[in-house]
Amino acid sequence: MSSNSDHHISVEHTDGVATIRFTRPSKHNAASAQLLLETLEALYRLESDDSVGAIVLTGEGAVFSAGFDLEEVPMGPASEIQSHFRLKALYYHAVIHMLARIEKPTLAAINGPAVGGGLGMSLACDLAVCTDRATFLPAWMSIGIANDASSSFYLPRIVGYRRAMEWLLTNRTLGADEAYEWGVVNRVFSEADFQSRVGEIARQLAAAPTHLQGLVKNRIQEGSSETLESCTEHEVQNVIASVGHPHFAERLAMFRSKEMRSSALAVDLDAVCGGR
């Protein structure tokens, strides 16, 4: 997909990594209806692309995303405005649901402020990293809109109930270091190192077996709302599915062979456990 003015995102492929880049820097990468639909279409295509092992979401320029594009809000009566937000919310949530459903790991590379729905989209990714100049702002309270973009689902799961309530009710801005302390991001990198470090992480994710990553995502997402018995039963089902995959046969053969000891691709249990 090209990054010209006809599109609100670009998609780049390098070393098994697909990068979805929001390309509206003059609008602070605000989520237009077109941007959301293009992002959704890109995720659909990337899901079935076997050459892609990991997906990065990031913004062009100095901002990750400012959330809903308020310039698209119609000037009509309240009913028209409500219809507009209903449709935009459905687009937004379709993207959020796809980020959860896709087997491949997703990484939010937060290059600058993540505001409102932009914050919500970053929370919906499996991992998140940011530059040391990134900031995070719920913003819904300040513009008179109830929080959405899956924030009520992901935020308390990521930062805990008290912090989620504090953040949404006070609407204060978190800097990169505090976002890391709260668990909003996994890592903070200097702006100079950001792109190279994002590339390193994304390539590492892309090199891992997608089917196992999908099983991990499913269990982590579903396990928090299950009983212990249900969770462990589903784990058994996933283990059985994974050992029936050719990847396991390959790794088992490596484990049983002498070559395994010098392989960087397999765990040396003697080294880990202190055996001979």
Curated annotation (Swiss-Prot):
User: Which InterPro entries is this protein grouped with?
Assistant: ClpP/crotonase-like_dom_sf (IPR029045), ECH/Chromodomain_protein (IPR051053), Enoyl-CoA_hyd/isom_CS (IPR018376), Enoyl-CoA_hydra/iso (IPR001753), Enoyl-CoA_hydra_C (IPR014748)
Record's family? Belongs to the enoyl-CoA hydratase/isomerase family.
Tell me the enzyme class: hydrolase
Q: Which residues form the signal peptide?
A: none
* Catalytic residues, chain numbering: H93 (proton acceptor), D148 (nucleophile)
Which Gene Ontology BP annotations are present?
coenzyme A metabolic process
Tell me the residue numbers annotated for binding substrate.
A66, G67, F68, D69, L70, E71, G117, R261
Give this protein's Gene Ontology molecular function annotations.
Answer: 4-chlorobenzoyl-CoA dehalogenase activity
Q: What keywords sit in the KW lines?
A: Hydrolase
Q: Which reaction does it catalyse?
A: 4-chlorobenzoyl-CoA + H2O = 4-hydroxybenzoyl-CoA + chloride + H(+)
User: What is the name listed in the Swiss-Prot or TrEMBL entry for this protein?
Assistant: 4-chlorobenzoyl coenzyme A dehalogenase-2
Query: What's this protein's function?
Result: Dehalogenates 4-chlorobenzoyl-CoA, 4-iodobenzoyl-CoA, 4-bromobenzoyl-CoA and, at a slower rate, 4-fluorobenzoyl-CoA. Does not dehalogenate 2-chlorobenzoyl-CoA or 3-chlorobenzoyl-CoA.
Cross-referenced SUPFAM superfamilies: ClpP/crotonase (SSF52096)
Organism in which the protein naturally occurs: Arthrobacter sp
